[in-house]
């Protein structure tokens, strides 16, 4: 099986994940993560609705009205980093080392959000 690391879609996912990781969106801050995703989704024809619940922005991206409905759900905020000196790489740099993306939110949940948006 060949490597897919150089496919345009892979590059888009990684680039968006890095851009999201580089935004310091510590709870409850969004740091414009949703704006970044909404801009991409709007260019793809999605209708973006923003809703505030207390102090938290939530975005709904819809495309079409036909059934069945399908939903991706996630969050852009991350927990505090703790002592950043204990990190192998700065938590908000989005460093790729040995093919692994490092940073706060890479696994929960900014990497997954990037994959959802690009898909």
Segments the model singles out, each with a brief description of its role:
Residues 105-119:
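Active-site alpha-helical elements of protease catalytic centers
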């Amino acid at each position: 099986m060949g490597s897919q690391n150089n496919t345009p879609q892979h590059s888009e996912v990684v680039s968006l994940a890095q851009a999201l990781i580089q935004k310091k969106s510590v709870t409850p801050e969004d740091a414009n993560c949703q704006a970044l995703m909404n801009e991409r989704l709007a260019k793809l024809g999605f209708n973006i609705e923003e809703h505030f619940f207390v102090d938290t922005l939530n975005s709904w991206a819809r495309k079409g009205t036909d059934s069945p409905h399908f939903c991706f759900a996630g969050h852009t905020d991350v927990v505090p980093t703790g002592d950043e000196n204990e990190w192998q790489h700065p938590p908000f740099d989005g460093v790729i080392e040995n093919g692994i993306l490092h940073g706060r939110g890479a696994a929960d949940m900014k990497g997954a959000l990037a994959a959802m948006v690009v898909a």
